UniProtKB/Swiss-Prot annotation:
A Pfam family that the UniProt record links to this protein: tRNA_anti-codon
UniProt subcellular location: Cytoplasm
Keyword Heme on entry: no
Record-listed L-aspartate binding positions: E181, R227, H455, R496
Record's protein name: Aspartate--tRNA(Asp/Asn) ligase
Domain of life: Bacteria
InterPro entries: Aa-tRNA-synt_II, aa-tRNA-synth_II, aa-tRNA-synth_II/BPL/LPL, Asp-tRNA-ligase_1, Asp-tRNA-ligase_1_N, Asp/Asn-tRNA-synth_IIb, AspRS_core, GAD-like_sf
Its job: Aspartyl-tRNA synthetase with relaxed tRNA specificity since it is able to aspartylate not only its cognate tRNA(Asp) but also tRNA(Asn). Reaction proceeds in two steps: L-aspartate is first activated by ATP to form Asp-AMP and then transferred to the acceptor end of tRNA(Asp/Asn).
Gene Ontology biological process: aspartyl-tRNA aminoacylation
Catalytic activity line of the entry: tRNA(Asx) + L-aspartate + ATP = L-aspartyl-tRNA(Asx) + AMP + diphosphate
Keywords annotated in UniProt: Aminoacyl-tRNA synthetase, ATP-binding, Cytoplasm, Ligase, Nucleotide-binding, Protein biosynthesis
Subunit structure: Homodimer.
Length: 600
């Protein structure tokens, strides 16, 4: 019950009345979901957060009936009346309240409503900008309301799970120092310190490590992360993550903790099932070799196979040249495609080209032979070897990409996911969690000609690889781990560096000298000199997890007030200009780009 006898609006919610309440006088408050006139009676479906209750208005109650005749969708009302059973045959099994209705004896219109810009009582396609502009109305729709309520249940479960394991929830500052972590910082000018700026945190990374130095040992926070980066896919300038850190911990301990949390969330809060328990663990190298991605979807097969050795000795120059140039030839076999037309094959080739491939070679297993435009370049023995390498059965298609490894992996990964969707290979009710571990600590940025951290600069190398920092840093493996489910990265974490000398060495490898390190990270380096314990953690994204569990196409559908893909808040019209007076107070003058570049 969410009201009381003295509450002037409601004694009950619109979702709680049952047959056991028959004969009771109740008050309900909410919105007019639908209104129908039948045989002289008016039927109103009254909706609130908890559900819908049918209310009837009898013409014998003249004034109340007249008021009901004027009701329109989304008017806010309060109704008083008696709970009665619905006439036999008129029950609605689709509603928890479907056995009863309320015979209204009084009606108060609390607020009328303009005609909404879209229907709220029906799930019909609506332009996304309109939905975001009127988000407060969009959130009244059942699917959106359920998304937000489910998100709340997930966050509550996380808090309870971690509290039971002695974690302490600590809020870290939102106004902090600018130390870019791969994306641009959002900057906040200081009025009290002219020409100086705070930054909004891209993550609480340094603060949570400092909390480990402070001795809290087990910390978590439902944290906001803000990044001024180019918007693509389902990224948002601000998102929510479970930020977590532990002292005196190991990679295994972090993985087991999160594995237990995610398994419980899925099994206790959803109807989905966890496909593999315990979660499989794949090294980064293994994931790339088998799936062409460090975010593999394990709900289906279509694994990649390396046929470079076969290609090296073949008569097919495209394959042979790629291998001789230091690249590779890999392929996958797919059944269930039937006869593919030239147009369909061109479409698959285009999918591969989106990953950078210059082409897509194809063969089809027919009987004991292979058919296709490149089959003539392979002997019968080579054809049999290719077929065996890919595990192709009669009728299967075999697709190959020959190029540098990054291009081969990206192209075949795109093709694999395209075939997944085309053939319906993935069970939507299954969650195939897996851990990706042993990432390289560094990668080489060819455009800028320098070494960069693959994840971030605070990651501890594997102990046995520390000597390689001086001789071959690109060969160093980091104590890094990602959690992936159904091809979506849900979390990223690592064991952290806790020694100042080692942290400075990593800084120097990525081009941060001692002076810059002191300026940007001096507090952290100083803290490490005071007996900093070994520590590690992880930061699962709340938005992506809820998106996955609710089968939504993007994270905007599970956020109350998201930005557009162009990083605009359509509802509040932000970002927006500020007054000259505000700028003067902050000692800021504007140097704007040309008009055509100002509003993307």
């Amino acid at each position: 019950m969410h009201g009381t006898a003295t509450n002037p609006y409601r004694t009950h919610t619109a979702g709680e009345l049952r047959a056991s309440n028959v004969g009771q006088r109740v008050r309900l408050a909410g919105w007019v979901h639908r209104r129908r006139d039948h045989g002289g009676l008016i039927f109103v479906d009254l909706r609130d957060r908890w559900g819908i209750t049918q209310v009837t208005f009898d013409p014998e109650r003249g004034e109340v009936f007249s008021a009901a005749e004027r009701l329109r969708p989304e008017w806010s009302v309060s109704v008083e009346g008696e709970v009665v059973r619905r006439p036999e045959g008129n029950e609605n099994p689709e509603l928890p309240t479907g056995e009863i209705e309320v015979e209204a004896s009084s009606l108060r219109v609390l607020n009328a409503s303009e005609t909404p810009p879209f229907e709220i009582d029906r799930e019909r396609p609506v332009d996304e900008l309109t939905r975001l502009r009127y988000r407060y109305l969009d959130l009244r729709r059942e699917r959106m309301r359920e998304n937000i309520l489910f998100r709340d249940r997930v966050v509550r479960y996380i808090r309870r799970y971690l509290a039971e394991r002695d974690f302490v929830e600590v809020e870290t500052p939102l106004l902090t120092k600018s130390t870019p972590e791969g994306a641009r910082d959002y900057l906040v000018p200081s009025r009290l310190y002219p020409g100086q700026f705070y930054a909004l945190p891209q993550s609480p990374q340094q603060f949570k490590q400092l909390l480990m130095v402070a001795g809290l040992e087990r910390y978590f926070q439902i944290a906001r992360a803000l990044r001024d980066e180019d918007q693509r896919g389902d990224r948002q300038p601000e998102h929510t993550q479970l930020d977590l850190e532990m002292s005196y911990t190991t990679q295994d301990e972090v993985l087991q903790l999160i594995e237990g949390l995610y398994t419980e969330i899925v099994e206790r809060l959803t109807e989905k099932r966890v496909l593999f328990k315990p979660f499989p663990r794949l090294t980064y190298a293994e994931a790339m070799e088998r799936f062409g991605s460090d975010k593999p979807d394990l709900r289906f097969g279509l694994e990649l196979r390396d046929v470079s050795d076969l290609a090296r000795s073949s008569e097919f120059k495209v394959f042979r040249n790629a291998v001789e140039a230091g690249g590779s030839v890999r392929g996958l076999a797919a059944g269930g495609l039937g006869d593919l037309s030239r147009r369909e094959l061109d479409g698959l080739t285009e999918v591969a080209r989106e990953g950078g491939a210059r082409g897509l070679a194809h063969l089809r297993a027919e009987g004991k032979a292979l058919k296709g435009p490149v089959a003539k370049f392979f002997s019968a023995e080579e054809q049999a070897a290719l077929r065996e390498a890919l595990g192709a059965r009669p009728g299967d298609w075999m697709f190959f990409v020959a190029d540098r490894d990054p291009v081969v992996f990206e192209s075949l990964n795109r093709l694999r996911l395209h075939l997944r969707d085309r053939l319906g290979l993935a069970d939507r009710d299954a969650l195939a969690f897996c851990w990706i571990t042993d990432f390289p600590l560094f990668e080489y940025n060819e455009e800028e000609g320098r070494i960069e951290p693959m994840h971030h600069m605070f990651t501890m190398p594997r102990e046995e690889d520390i000597p390689l920092l001086d001789t071959d840093p690109l060969a160093v493996t980091g104590q890094l781990y990602d959690l992936v489910a159904n091809g979506v990265e849900l979390a990223s974490g690592s064991i952290r560096i806790h020694r100042p000398d080692l942290q400075q060495k990593v800084f120097s490898i990525i081009g941060i000298d001692e002076e810059e390190a002191e300026r940007r990270f001096g507090t952290l380096l100083r803290a490490f000199r005071y007996g900093a314990p070994p520590h590690g953690g992880i930061a699962p994204g709340i938005d992506r997890l809820v998106m996955l569990l609710r089968d939504e196409p993007n994270i905007r559908e599970v956020m109350a007030f998201p930005k557009t893909q162009a990083a605009r808040d359509e509802m509040m019209d932000a970002p927006s200009p500020v007054s000259e007076e505000q700028l003067r107070e902050l000692h800021i003058s504007l140097c704007l780009p040309p008009e055509e570049r100002r509003n993307p």
